[in-house]
Amino acid sequence: MSSRQPLLDALGVELPDELLSLALTHRSYAYEHGGLPTNERLEFLGDAVLGLTITDALYHRHPDRTEGDLAKLRASVVNTQALADVARKLCDGGLGAHLLLGRGEANTGGADKSSILADGMESLLGAIYLQHGIDTAREVILRLFGALLDAAPTLGAGLDWKTSLQELTAARGMGAPSYLVTSTGPDHDKEFTAVVVVADTEYGTGVGRSKKEAEQKAAAATWKALDVLDSAAQTSA
């Protein structure tokens, strides 16, 4: 069995070796190997296919939602962090284990960088669309992103959890959130931990390969924690 077969099994489709390799080729690898084609064109295509599929699904699931509400729901599903999370769970080792990265990128944790994983996920979706058409691509997307679609009404503006959290705390008169960030590890392999403080109280914590990723995860955890507290208060009222 091909070492990439578990990835194809997780996607639920077959792809020609040449097309699959292209979808997995990051620009850092292409540069180190004499300027090979990269997955960026497929990423561009996959982004459009993903956006259309999710938009169509939300439009039909929520007939009473306004355009603005639908845009927020889509942002909670189609964003770098959500794509990266899907990529990490795609198969044993995640998508990162199959990406073709340059040595420099690989040595700095590129296989787990959210931006690279998100781009790779979109590239695969673009490849599926090219090989199998929109119907199959749609089936794959709805299966992989189904849980996110179901949870979209409770997720907040996942495109930018920090902004979403700031809007929530402002609406509740809690003041602006602040972030306490620490890091561990050598310069080439740092891990960042962020803790959100709102009204002198520590809430969510997030860990990531970059300060931005850690803060976004911490903001997401805090948003959800505050939402749970609000729901509990309404239930007991």
Swiss-Prot record:
Residues 160-228 form the DRBM domain. It catalyses: Endonucleolytic cleavage to 5'-phosphomonoester. It comes from the Bacteria. GO terms for molecular function: double-stranded RNA binding; metal ion binding; ribonuclease III activity; rRNA binding. The active site is at residues 47, 122. Belongs to the ribonuclease III family. Residues 3-133 form the RNase III domain. This is Ribonuclease 3. It is found in: Cytoplasm. Transmembrane segments: none annotated. It holds the Pfam family Ribonucleas_3_3. Gene3D superfamilies: 3.30.160.20, Ribonuclease III domain. GO terms for cellular component: cytoplasm. Homodimer.
